[in-house]
Amino acid sequence: MTVLHSVDFFPSGKAPVAIEPRLPQAAFPEHHHDFHEIVIVEHGTGIHVFNGQPYTISGGTVCFVRDHDRHLYEHTDNLCLTNVLWRSPDAFQFLAGLDQLLPQEQDGYYPSHWRVNQSVLQQVRQLVGLMERAGDGVDAPAVANREILFMQLLVLLRRSSLMEGATNNDAKLNQLMAWLEDHFAEEVCWEAVAEQFSLSLRTLHRQLKQHTGLTPQRYLNRLRLIKARHLLRHSDHSVTEIAYRCGFGDSNHFSTLFRREFNWSPRDIRQGRDAIIQ
C-alpha cells in the first residue's frame, strides 16, 4: 500500500498545515499517510473507499481522514477536491482541544463523512484562500494567524455540518443523501422521501441533479451498485443474495445494471478480473 509522507507535502519541517488542491482528482489507489487530512469536495462525483467501506461523494462532502486511516478514490467524474493537511493535534503552537471540533469514534463507529451546503462551501473556499496566502513567517503573530484560520475552518465545518441540523433546502438534501446511504436497500418512494425531508418532489429532483449530475433513481441505483460491488469483493454471498441485500428485486436486472455501470459483470468482479486495472 502506498504511504504518503508529510515531508513531501508540507512547506517546512514545522508547518502544521498545508493546502493540497486536486483539480481534478483522478482515481487513486489505496493509501495512507503520516498526517491528518480534511478532504473538501468542491464538485463532481466519485467513490471514496474509506477503511474498506465505499461512500458516494459529491460537492459539499467533507471527509476527515486520520493518520491511521486508509482510503482510495475510484469511479471519479470531474471530482475536484481541496485537501487541508495537518500534521497532528500537538503540532500547533497556539491551539489545543481540537478534538472537540472533530468527529469522534464511538463504539467502533467513526463518522468520517459530513456534508455542508453550497453557501458554506463558498465560505470554506474563502478561508482556504486566506490560508494559502497567509505566508510562511515564523514569528509568533504569523504562526498564530495561520493557526487561527485553521481553527476558523474547523468551527465553520462543525457548525455547518449535517450534524447541526440546518433547515434550508440544501441542508435538507444533505440529510436526505445521508439517509439514502443507510437505507439504500429499502424500497424507496420518492414522494414519501420528499415529504419526510420537507422538500417538494420537484425540488428534490432538481437539487439532487445539481449536486450529483444524476436523477434520484439513477443516484439510488448507483449507490446500490457500489455497495453490491463492495460485497462482491469482500463477502462470500452469492450474486443473487447480494442483489437482494442491495435493494434489487431481480438478479438479472441487477446484473444488467451492474455491467452498464462498471463495464464488468458481477461474476467478473467476484473472480477479480478487474484487478488488473484497479
Swiss-Prot record:
Residues with site note (Interaction with sigma-70): 241, 250
Encoding gene per record: rhaS
Function in brief: Activates expression of the rhaBAD and rhaT operons.
Subunit structure: Binds DNA as a dimer.
Protein name per the record: HTH-type transcriptional activator RhaS
Claim: Transcription regulation is one of the keywords in the record: yes
Entry keyword set: Activator, Cytoplasm, DNA-binding, Repeat, Rhamnose metabolism, Transcription, Transcription regulation
Location in the cell: Cytoplasm
InterPro entries: AraC-bd, AraC_XylS_family_regulators, Homeodomain-like_sf, HTH-like, HTH_AraC, HTH_AraC-typ_CS, RhaR_RhaS-like_N, RmlC-like_jellyroll
Chief subcellular location: cytoplasm
SMART domains: HTH_ARAC (SM00342)
Annotated ranges, domain HTH araC/xylS-type: 174-272
